[in-house]
């Protein structure tokens, strides 16, 4: 069931599990018969979980978490912090703030192998919900009953434009929908009563390059600005503050390894 939900396709799920599509279909049908529910429905050629299917899926996830917890407990000796851990982070935090924590974790726990995946905040939330990553860090507060979120760092949003250029506020480089930064960029434009032509770019470094070239302006996290940026760009404070949040699935089993990793992620994030 979990693989079908991830793949959004019986055929793709079968390929991922190295089995046949009819076998997957029989397994889902068996679930429906056992629990007397309809698991999936199709709307406009898109497969989605029914309300009963969503409940069943959450129970399956919880069971998987418990099985994973049991296996980890049985393998854990002397609270050793070892093995693999999957960390999902928003682009801004991952590219500009995460290196210090990763370095510290590598020094403290050389047997721990952390696999980092960077994406926008919405995607990281979905990966947490579907148990694709163990821990997530996002750029906005999450309103979801399946997610536990804890603020771990404060951030400041600023407007940037090239110092030497005329006040070009006609073109704004902005992040894609789903990015935590996008929400605050829109708030900043509203606050300044600006209605510029928007160019969507899903990479902050490229956005800054466009601003350095004098092609327009942007609204970004102050933590993304280097000393070179501060020297060449005009930085205007917008009095917009936000937090970065550490997120976990509410049913995630927090073993000793997770506790120690989370503790380090909450430290030295400025």
From Swiss-Prot:
The record places domain HTH lysR-type at 1-50
Note the InterPro entries from the entry. LysR_subst-bd, Tscrpt_reg_HTH_LysR, WH-like_DNA-bd_sf, WH_DNA-bd_sf
Residue ranges of the annotated DNA-binding region, renumbered to this chain: 10-29
Top-level taxon of origin? Bacteria
Pfam families for the chain: HTH_1, LysR_substrate
Keyword match Transcription regulation: yes
SUPFAM superfamilies in alphabetical order: Periplasmic binding protein-like II, Winged helix' DNA-binding domain
Recorded hits in PROSITE patterns, A to Z, give: HTH_LYSR (PS50931)
Keywords for the protein's UniProt record, in alphabetical order: DNA-binding, Transcription, Transcription regulation
One Gene Ontology molecular-function label: transcription cis-regulatory region binding
Q: Which residues form a coiled coil?
A: none
Protein family membership: Belongs to the LysR transcriptional regulatory family.
Please report the name of this protein according to its UniProt entry. Answer: Uncharacterized HTH-type transcriptional regulator in lacR 5'region
Species per Swiss-Prot/TrEMBL record: Staphylococcus xylosus
Q: Mind giving the lineage of the organism this protein is from? A: Bacteria, Bacillati, Bacillota, Bacilli, Bacillales
């Amino acid at each position: 069931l979990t693989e079908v939900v991830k793949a959004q396709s019986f055929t793709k799920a079968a390929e991922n599990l190295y089995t046949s599509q009819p076998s997957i279909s029989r397994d889902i049908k068996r679930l429906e018969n056992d629990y007397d529910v309809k698991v999936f429905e199709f709307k406009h050629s898109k497969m989605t979980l029914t309300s009963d299917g969503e409940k069943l899926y959450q129970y399956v996830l919880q069971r998987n978490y418990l099985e994973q917890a049991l296996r980890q407990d049985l393998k854990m000796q002397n609270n050793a912090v070892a093995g693999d851990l999957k960390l999902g982070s928003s682009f801004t935090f991952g590219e500009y703030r995460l290196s210090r924590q990763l370095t510290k974790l590598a020094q403290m726990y050389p047997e721990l192998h952390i696999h980092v995946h960077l994406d926008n905040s919405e995607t990281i939330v979905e990966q947490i919900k579907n148990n694709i990553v163990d821990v997530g860090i996002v750029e906005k507060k999450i309103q979801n009953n399946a997610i536990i979120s804890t603020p771990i760092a404060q951030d400041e949003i600023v407007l940037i434009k090239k110092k030497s250029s005329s006040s070009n506020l006609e073109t704004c480089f902005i992040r894609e929908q789903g990015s935590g930064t996008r929400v605050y960029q829109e708030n900043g434009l509203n606050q300044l009563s600006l209605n510029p032509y928007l160019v969507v770019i899903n990479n902050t470094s490229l956005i800054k390059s466009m601003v350095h070239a004098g092609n327009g302006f942007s609204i970004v996290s102050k933590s993304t600005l280097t000393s070179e940026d501060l020297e060449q760009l005009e930085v205007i404070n917008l009095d917009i503050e936000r937090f970065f949040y550490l997120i976990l699935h509410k049913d995630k089993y927090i073993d000793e390894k997770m506790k120690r990793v989370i503790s380090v992620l909450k430290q030295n994030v400025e």
